[in-house]
Structures are given as structure tokens and as C-alpha cells.
């Protein structure tokens, strides 16, 4: 689960980190009042969406009058912002963040992720702030400094000082940087974060360290013990199909192809997508119905797949271990009858009650094609989708 910038900065303030005075606004009138409250004659106005690249898309602007604040809010509130990280529809803008303007002398990068290889939280810092860190990692990886956090002792001040000195900061700035580093480390652990970025972390004209941006991602598996964070969820930023799948505890990720996939087990789902690709097709989604799938969940999974208008055929690949193939077959039949499926459905059943499941599908009288093997299923679904 991701947070908006203004929500991330609320958490930053909770941990004593330096952020700009700012207010998230729902209307143009609120935006103007926020600018008046902040004072001055220059403000920064930002569209609040769960996507990067806002500045290049016109979603971040420096304004020098209250009329410009109002105009920006009226331009974007209720509209969709399209960036290089969104699809062609973009993300809806429901709030505008109005902030005081910060003078910038230098830009840095500071972020943290959970490194699965080392099984530790890893902080990354760079002098290349204000640009995509992925670009820096690819072109000049030596400019990225790292500090691994030992989970048995937690983050240590010396690690922050070491990063600060390597970034070329002055002793006073290193002290400020270390405070930011320790606050972020505490926040990362306390709120079960999966990703944390400040890009840029700036040095002001006065020589102070300042958090100019906030990108925060939470481990969704930990939300059950984070009620405060759970309340910050903005469902308008979620893919509608992914949100519906989450209600049924289905693991669904929308993709760009035209072959819908429904599989039990994440590994088998990945393998199914691979063989579809190798056979000349393009998967429209990743969908794992899980080992304990019920008839109702299978039916809902089918409806979610078919809600994507780009889907031209569906491949169902089930290995019956915990889940029974005949129950999956009943779910498929129920969904096909309820939704009124117009696209071919190719089904490969193997394992627990596979023969009974195949029999039920064959006797249904629906447009369902049985496959003898996974490779056969992939060939048939690619052909059914037009080989695209």
C-alpha cells in the first residue's frame, strides 16, 4: 500500500524530520486559504497521486500569486494526471498539496528498502538527488552509497554519520543528516514499511538538511497491525480490478496483454505466464486463486479477469492438490454462465479430481476447451486469442 506525499510528510513530522509547511486541499478555495495561512508570495502546488513523474506531467508547479494557486487547483482537482508511471488513463487527483517554497542549494537522495538477498533494511544515499535513482543505479552505480541495518541492533548513528561524510556534507549538516537517518529507520520499522524515498533531500541556502519529498510504501501483509496506516488508504488510486481481487483475497496484478490467466499457486502462475509468452502470446494479468480456493472465489476471479475488455481468451491452469479440480470446474461454469462469456476459455486440470472436473466442463455445453497438457493449453489459448 502506498501513501500520498502529504501523508508521508505527516509521518515525517511525527518523527521530528524537517518538512515544509503545507496543507492538503480538496477544493480551490481551500488551496487559496492554505496559501494565505502559509504566507509569503511564492508557493509550490502539487497534485497528490500515487505515481512519479508528476513534475514533467505538469502536476507540480511553482506559483507566485493566489490567482495562480486557484487556477492550478481548478485545473487538476477532479481530473486525471498521466505520467510515465501511470497507464493512459492516469491517476485521479482528489487533493492538491500547497507548500511553502524552499530555496535549494543542493539536492541529495535518501531511500530505504527491504533487501531480500541480505534480509535486511538497506539505506541508499546519493549526491544525485532530484533524478530517477534507477537511472543513477544503471549509469553510475558507484554514486550510490549503502548502509545495511542489522535487525538485531537496529540503525546506529555512526551509519548515518558515515553516509553524511561520504556525501560531502559539513559537520553540522552531518549531524542533521544523522537525525533524519535515525528518524527514518525508526519509522521504517515501526510502521512496517517496504519502501521509503526522499528525492530530493535538499540542502537549503541556509545550509540546513530538508525533506522536500516523501514516497512511502507499506508492506500490505502488515496492515492488520497498522490501523493508523490502514486509514490512510486511498482506494481511488488502486486499479479497480486489483482492489476487487483484494476483497476476495486473490493475488491479482493487471498487465498489458490479451490472454487472461487464472492459476492456483504463485509459482505455477509465473510459469504459466512464461509459457504463454514463449508460445507467442501476451498475458493480460497475473492471478493466483490460492491453494484454499472456494467456488465463490474462483467465480469472482473469473469475473475480474473478464472485466478487462482487452482479454480475448482465458487460460485456466489448475493443479489439484489442496484444491479440488471439480470444485474449480463448478466455479468456472458458474462464472461463465453468470457473466455471459463471449471469449474462448481453455482449461488445463491436473491432479485431485481432475477427471471429474474435466467431465463437468465437457458436459456444461459452454465454450470451454479442454487441454491435455500445459504446452497444449498455451498453444490453444494463443491461437484462440488470434496469436496476438
Swiss-Prot record:
One Gene Ontology MF term: succinate-CoA ligase (GDP-forming) activity
Domain ATP-grasp: 9-244
Key word ATP-binding present: yes
Details of cofactor binding: Binds 1 Mg(2+) ion per subunit.
Pathway it works in: Carbohydrate metabolism; tricarboxylic acid cycle; succinate from succinyl-CoA (ligase route): step 1/1
Residue positions binding ATP: 46, 53-55, 99, 102, 107
Chain's role: Succinyl-CoA synthetase functions in the citric acid cycle (TCA), coupling the hydrolysis of succinyl-CoA to the synthesis of either ATP or GTP and thus represents the only step of substrate-level phosphorylation in the TCA. The beta subunit provides nucleotide specificity of the enzyme and binds the substrate succinate, while the binding sites for coenzyme A and phosphate are found in the alpha subunit.
Name the record gives this protein: Succinate--CoA ligase [ADP-forming] subunit beta
Gene that specifies this protein: sucC
Amino acid at each position: 500500500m502506498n501513501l500520498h506525499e502529504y501523508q508521508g510528510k505527516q509521518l515525517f513530522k511525527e518523527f521530528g524530520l524537517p518538512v515544509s509547511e503545507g496543507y492538503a486541499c480538496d477544493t480551490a478555495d481551500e488551496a487559496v486559504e492554505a496559501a494565505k495561512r502559509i504566507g509569503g508570495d511564492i508557493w509550490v502546488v502539487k497534485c497528490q497521486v500515487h505515481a512519479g513523474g508528476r513534475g514533467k506531467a505538469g502536476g507540480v508547479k511553482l506559483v507566485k500569486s493566489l490567482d495562480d494557486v486557484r487556477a492550478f487547483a481548478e485545473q487538476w482537482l477532479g481530473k486525471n494526471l498521466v505520467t510515465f508511471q501511470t497507464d493512459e488513463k492516469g491517476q485521479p487527483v482528489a487533493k492538491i498539496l500547497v507548500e511553502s517554497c524552499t530555496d535549494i542549494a543542493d539536492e541529495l537522495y535518501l531511500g530505504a528498502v527491504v533487501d531480500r538477498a541480505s534480509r535486511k533494511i538497506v539505506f541508499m544515499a546519493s549526491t544525485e538527488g532530484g533524478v530517477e535513482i534507477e537511472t543513477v543505479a544503471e549509469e553510475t552505480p558507484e554514486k550510490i552509497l549503502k548502509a545495511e541495518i542489522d535487525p538485531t541492533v537496529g540503525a546506529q548513528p555512526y551509519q548515518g554519520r558515515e553516509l553524511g561524510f561520504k556525501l560531502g556534507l559539513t559537520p553540522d549538516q552531518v549531524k542533521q543528516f544523522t537525525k533524519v537517518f535515525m528518524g527514518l529507520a525508526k519509522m521504517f520499522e515501526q510502521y512496517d514499511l517496504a519502501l521509503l524515498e526522499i528525492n530530493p533531500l535538499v540542502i537549503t541556502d541556509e545550509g540546513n538538511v530538508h525533506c522536500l519529498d516523501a514516497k512511502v510504501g507499506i508492506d500490505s501483509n502488515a496492515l492488520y497491525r497498522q490501523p493508523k496506516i490502514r486509514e490512510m488508504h486511498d482506494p481511488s488510486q488502486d486499479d479497480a480490478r486489483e482492489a476487487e481481487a483484494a476483497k476476495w483475497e486473490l493475488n491479482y496484478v493487471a498487465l498489458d496483454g490479451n490472454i487472461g490467466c487464472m492459476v492456483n499457486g504463485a509459482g505455477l502462475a509465473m510459469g504459466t505466464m512464461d509459457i504463454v509468452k514463449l508460445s507467442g502470446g501476451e498475458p493480460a494479468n497475473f492471478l493466483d486463486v490460492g491453494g484454499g480456493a472456494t467456488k465463490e472465489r474462483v467465480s469472482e476471479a473469473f469475473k475480474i479477469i473478464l472485466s478487462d475488455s482487452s482479454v480475448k481468451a482465458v487460460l485456466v491452469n489448475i493443479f489439484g492438490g489442496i484444491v479440488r479440480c471439480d470444485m474449480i470446474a463448478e466455479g468456472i461454469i458458474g462464472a461463465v454462465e453468470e457473466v455471459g462469456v463471449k471469449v474462448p476459455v481453455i482449461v488445463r486440470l491436473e491432479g485431485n479430481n481432475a477427471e471429474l472436473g474435466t467431465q463437468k466442463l465437457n458436459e456444461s455445453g459452454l465454450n470451454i476447451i479442454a487441454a491435455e497438457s500445459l504446452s497444449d493449453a498455451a498453444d490453444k489459448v494463443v491461437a484462440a486469442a488470434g496469436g496476438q
